[in-house]
Every structure is written in structure tokens, then in C-alpha cells.
Design a protein with these regions (language model features):
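Intrinsically disordered, low-complexity Pro/Gly/Ser/Thr-rich segments with frequent PxxP/GP/PP motifs
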Residues: 3, 7-12, 16-25, 29, ...
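Edge strands and adjacent loops of beta-rich recognition modules
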Residues: 32-57
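Short, solvent-exposed loop/turn segments enriched in Ser/Thr/Gly
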Residues: 62-68
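Asparagine-centered strand-capping/turn motif at beta-strand->loop junctions
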Residues: 68-79
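Short Gly/aromatic-enriched secondary-structure transition segments
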Residues: 84-88
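An exposed acidic His-Trp-rich patch
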Residues: 91-115, 233-264
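Structured domain cores in non-transmembrane regions
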Residues: 101-193
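A contiguous, surface-oriented mixed alpha/beta subdomain in the mid-to-C-terminal portion of proteins
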Residues: 162-260
Length: 265
């Protein structure tokens, strides 16, 4: 089932938030968000479930289908896939179109987008957890997914726009991939990305973070508990840092007026 909380259910969740002290490195600024969440869901993260061998993600058939993957959850608790989370392997790498909670002991399909335009052949029988999408790609994808959700009830992206975003990342960073894989941009910039990760460790107790890049608002990510954010911090940060590197390399980007403090007011 897809996890799409309504505004009414989010209000008490947001009301408890407290804004922490900002921290930054080069052109990336993070403001931690702390506070208690009402209630707790019993779930495990998809990456952990895959590593534990209780969750399998495959193509929906031998022939495959670009916008969907098959999930078999053998765990006794729900499994959470995160919006923008990357899955690598099978016929081509994908990212989640939206956050999804998969019921215990169940099988389902999840909505995804391709982030490896030049491959449609098996590299492995199933998928492993990868990195996390940069916030620019997530924002573009989310706008398109939101439109199709309202119009059709289905979480479908504009696949061409996703490929354009991945190509723009490679162009800005000077990275190269024969299959135009987003993952290759991350691998080829690993030293620079690690500089951001080392300078910006997980802020203890935070269950959310507000992000700005080069002075412009980029993203807010918020979770029901600090443990979830801490667990995915390095992958989430890699996505933010990739956007920050793109901004450093693209001198033509105009400054945006909406910074972190403006958004949090």
C-alpha cells in the first residue's frame, strides 16, 4: 500500500517540531528538526530488510516493466520504502516514485522510475539497496507524480524528465556512464561527497532536516522517529551533497530567494 498522509494527520506531527542550530559545509546548509511524534509505526527500512534476506525486489516478470517492480515481504512487520530511494540491479536501476509501506507477509508492486537510461538487460536476478536521489531530481519527480496521483490515482512520473535530470547531473559534474546511470555520478564523485558527509554528521535527536543549497531552499525530510533519520543519514546526505556539487559546478544558476529560514517561518 502507498503511504500518502493527509494534511489533517500531519498537523499534530508538525506542531511538535523544534528548530535546531544550523550547520553547513561549503554551499550546503542543514537545519535539524526535533520533537516527539504522536504514535509509532512498527516498520523496518527496505534497505535493512533486503540485507536481512526478508525482502526481495525483482522485475514484475522476465520481460520487466519500467514503472513497476515486484516486492515480496517475508518479514513479520511492515517495510518502508522511501521516496527517491535507489534500487540497483536486475534490468535497470530504479528509484521510488513515492514512499511506500508494504504490509507484513505480503506481495505487491511498487511505483518506480528508471535512473539508468541505457541498460535494459539483467545484471542480477533481483535488486539491492543503492543510494538516494538528489533533491532536485526528487522535486521534479514529485511534481509530476503529484499531478498523476490527482488525475489518475497512480504514482507515475514523467520518465523523460527523470532521465533529463540524471543527464543534467552528469553534465554538471563531468561524470560519465555508458548507461547514463545515476549511481555512476555518485561513485565518480565519492571523494567530494565524503567531504560533505564528514563535515555534516547526523545531528543527535533530529527526526527531520531542512536543507538549503547555495542559499536556496532545497528540501525538507521528516520522519516519525530519530532512529529512522539516523539510519538513512549517510544515503540521504549523499543526495543533498550531489545537488550541492552540481550547484558549485553550474555557475549559470541564479540565486533563489527562498532560503531555509524563510521556509521555516
Amino acid at each position: 500500500m502507498e503511504f500518502r498522509p493527509k494534511a489533517a494527520t500531519l498537523a499534530p506531527f508538525i506542531d511538535t517540531l523544534k528548530v535546531g542550530d544550523g550547520m553547513g559545509h561549503l554551499n550546503l546548509t542543514l537545519v535539524p528538526l526535533r520533537g516527539e511524534a504522536p504514535g509509532r509505526l512498527d516498520y523496518t527500512l527496505a534497505a535493512d530488510a533486503i540485507a536481512a534476506g526478508v525482502l526481495t525486489v525483482t522485475e514484475v516478470s522476465e520481460g520487466g516493466s519500467v514503472p513497476h517492480l515486484a516486492v515480496a515481504n517475508e518479514a513479520t512487520k511492515m517495510v518502508l520504502f522511501l521516496d527517491g530511494e535507489e534500487l540497483v540491479g536486475a534490468k535497470q536501476n530504479r528509484i521510488l516514485n513515492t514512499s511506500v509501506l508494504v504490509a507484513p507477509k505480503s506481495r505487491t508492486k511498487i511505483p518506480v522510475s528508471c535512473v539508468e537510461q541505457g541498460r535494459w538487460r539483467y545484471a542480477s536476478p533481483d535488486f539491492q539497496a543503492g543510494g538516494h536521489s538528489p533533491s532536485g531530481l526528487r522535486a521534479r519527480k514529485s511534481r509530476d507524480v503529484g499531478r498523476t496521483l490527482r488525475a489518475t490515482g497512480r504514482a507515475v512520473s514523467d520518465q523523460g524528465a527523470v532521465w533529463d535530470e540524471v543527464a543534467a547531473v552528469h553534465a554538471a559534474l563531468g561524470s560519465h556512464s555508458p548507461t547514463m546511470a545515476m549511481h555512476e555520478a555518485i561513485d565518480q564523485c565519492r571523494d567530494s561527497l565524503d567531504g560533505y558527509l564528514k563535515a555534516l554528521p547526523y545531528p543527535q535527536g533530529a527526526r527531520g532536516v531542512c536543507v538549503s543549497i547555495s542559499g536556496a531552499f532545497a528540501a525538507i525530510d521528516l520522519f516519525d522517529r530519530p532512529e529512522t533519520l539516523e539510519r538513512i543519514w549517510s544515503r540521504l546526505m549523499t543526495g543533498y551533497a550531489l545537488d550541492a556539487l552540481v550547484a558549485l559546478n553550474r555557475k549559470d544558476l541564479p540565486p533563489a530567494p527562498r532560503g531555509v529560514l524563510h521556509v521555516l517561518e
